[in-house]
């Protein structure tokens, strides 16, 4: 079976990491054994170093400008693309990504309000035509997101943003999903089993049993 690139998107607490692993196990049942899962930001030594800066800031609590944040995210993404994702796809692997470029459009574009032209220029340069075959957007409200992540020992810089920030992020996600046929919106307020089954049905239709 040819390689595929599938990404999972949404607010923190939506269940992205769990669903990423469930999708991998489901594909295994259909004979797809060459699977690589990734997460952003991170996934290479350089990307993981940048992840710490992005999520927790630099030494001495130096403030991080929103453009600096954006550039670090794209630097981490470029390392992941060139050193992990592209090599895996070239070998015929299916890559399942916990976040990709859509996160930047939603968080830095929608949440931070960064100019869309700058975002598009960076996206085009860094991803260089690499685009997911299919994206699942796990939709939950900011209120539910916050309630789900509050148990974490330490919230990162972005997780500590006010509710209005996540309202903008969610609105941007929903707008982008409405404009692109390969972004499937999933109601992630459902139980984990219901969310999983909904995603499995879409995987069947798109890739596994398209003839039925």
Swiss-Prot record:
> Which positions are annotated as binding ATP?
10-17
Keyword Nucleotide-binding annotated? yes
Q: What's its EC?
A: 2.7.4.9
| Molecular function as annotated in GO | ATP binding; dTMP kinase activity
Transmembrane parts of this sequence = none
User: Which InterPro entries does UniProt cross-reference here?
Assistant: P-loop_NTPase (IPR027417), Thymidylate_kin-like_dom (IPR039430), Thymidylate_kin_CS (IPR018095), Thymidylate_kinase (IPR018094)
Q: Which UniProt keywords apply?
A: ATP-binding, Kinase, Nucleotide biosynthesis, Nucleotide-binding, Transferase
Enzymatic reactions: dTMP + ATP = dTDP + ADP
Q: Does the keyword field hold Plastid? A: no
Which cellular component terms (GO) are annotated to the entry?
A: cytosol
Q: What class of enzyme is it?
A: transferase
Domain of life, per UniProt, equals Bacteria
Look up the record and give one Gene Ontology term from the biological process aspect.
dTDP biosynthetic process
| Coiled-coil region(s) | none
What is a single Pfam family found in this protein's UniProt entry?
Thymidylate_kin
Similarity-based family: Belongs to the thymidylate kinase family.
User: Which PANTHER family does UniProt cross-reference here?
Assistant: THYMIDYLATE KINASE, UMP-CMP KINASE 2, MITOCHONDRIAL
Function as written in the Swiss-Prot or TrEMBL entry: Phosphorylation of dTMP to form dTDP in both de novo and salvage pathways of dTTP synthesis.
Protein name in UniProt: Thymidylate kinase
What is the source species?
A: Blochmanniella pennsylvanica (strain BPEN)
Q: What gene name is listed for this protein?
A: tmk
């Amino acid at each position: 079976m040819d390689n595929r690139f599938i990404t999972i998107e949404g607010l923190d607490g939506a269940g992205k990491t769990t669903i990423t692993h469930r999708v991998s196990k489901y594909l295994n049942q259909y004979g797809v054994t060459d699977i690589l899962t990734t997460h952003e930001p991170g996934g290479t030594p350089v990307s993981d170093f940048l992840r710490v800066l992005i999520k927790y800031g630099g030494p001495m609590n130096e403030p991080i400008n929103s453009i600096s944040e954006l550039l670090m995210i794209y630097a981490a993404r470029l390392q992941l693309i060139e050193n992990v994702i592209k090599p895996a796809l070239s070998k015929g692997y299916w890559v399942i990504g916990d976040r990709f470029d859509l996160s930047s459009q939603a968080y830095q574009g929608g949440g931070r309000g960064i100019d869309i032209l700058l975002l598009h220029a960076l996206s085009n340069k860094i991803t260089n035509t690499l685009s997911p075959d299919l994206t699942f957007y796990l939709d939950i409200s900011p209120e539910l997101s916050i309630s789900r992540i509050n148990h974490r020992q330490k919230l990162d810089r972005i997780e500590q943003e006010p509710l209005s920030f996540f309202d903008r992020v969610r609105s941007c996600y929903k707008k982008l999903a409405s404009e692109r046929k390969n972004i499937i919106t999933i109601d992630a307020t459902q139980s984990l089993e219901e969310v999983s089954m909904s995603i499995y049905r879409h995987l069947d239709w798109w890739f596994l049993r398209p003839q039925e």
